[in-house]
Amino acid sequence: MSNVRSKICGITRIEDALAAAEAGADAIGFVFYAKSPRAVDVRQARAIMAELPPFVTTVGLFVNASRCELNEILEAVPLDLLQFHGDETPADCEGYHRPWIKALRVRPGDDLEAACRHYAGARGILLDTYVAGVPGGTGEAFDWSLVPSRLSKPIILAGGLSAGNVGQAIAQVRPYAVDVSGGVEQAKGIKDAAKIEAFMRAVKQA
């Protein structure tokens, strides 16, 4: 049985958040990026969080948000963890009194250990698929052999994961956690409870 943690990202509906919690997800993610088909506003996020059972970590995903915008959201939504998914510098990620992780879009030749050191304050590094001009949510997997066997920060593996490949991904990369969005959807922003359950079962059996 795997002890790899899991996050279901791109939650937009209460029923999807509850399905994730029921299936055993450790965290759910809210996308505060207006260009995403999975974007939520403050009102939606608050309503969903009000229905969550305890011990489910709430993560806010941001893409090059201004400090003013991010502070306004944090005043209204009590997020547990921040995920920076754009071109943010380490300084951009600090100062919010929340733990944070930094997403990197992986390309051949990237020095991921150098990136871990660069984002020294991050609690973990999320590795996602590189597609030019797209910050994330591509639904495509990347070449997992690009991930070194040892890195100095916990690794959250994302990018094209599903119930069909997450077991292989865990076996190959040995991440701290996995992150899924499109792989458990029936449409963008609309999750499928059966796919969530199948994904979580595959994670636990890995």
From Swiss-Prot:
Query: Which GO MF term does the entry hold, naming one?
Result: phosphoribosylanthranilate isomerase activity
The enzyme's first-digit EC class, named in words, is isomerase
Identify the InterPro entries for this entry. Answer: Aldolase_TIM (IPR013785), PRAI_dom (IPR001240), RibuloseP-bd_barrel (IPR011060), TrpF_fam (IPR044643)
Q: Is Chloroplast a UniProt keyword of this protein? A: no
Q: Which UniProt keywords apply?
A: Amino-acid biosynthesis, Aromatic amino acid biosynthesis, Isomerase, Tryptophan biosynthesis
Does this UniProt record's set of keywords contain Aminoacyl-tRNA synthetase? no
Question: Could you tell me what this protein is called?
Answer: N-(5'-phosphoribosyl)anthranilate isomerase
Functional pathway: Amino-acid biosynthesis; L-tryptophan biosynthesis; L-tryptophan from chorismate: step 3/5
Enumerate the NCBIfam families for this protein: PRK01222.1-4, PRK01222.1-6
Reaction(s) catalysed by this chain, per the record, are: N-(5-phospho-beta-D-ribosyl)anthranilate = 1-(2-carboxyphenylamino)-1-deoxy-D-ribulose 5-phosphate
Q: What Gene Ontology terms for biological process does this UniProt record contain?
A: L-tryptophan biosynthetic process
Q: Which family does it belong to?
A: Belongs to the TrpF family.
UniProt xrefs under Pfam families: PRAI
**EC number per UniProt:** 5.3.1.24
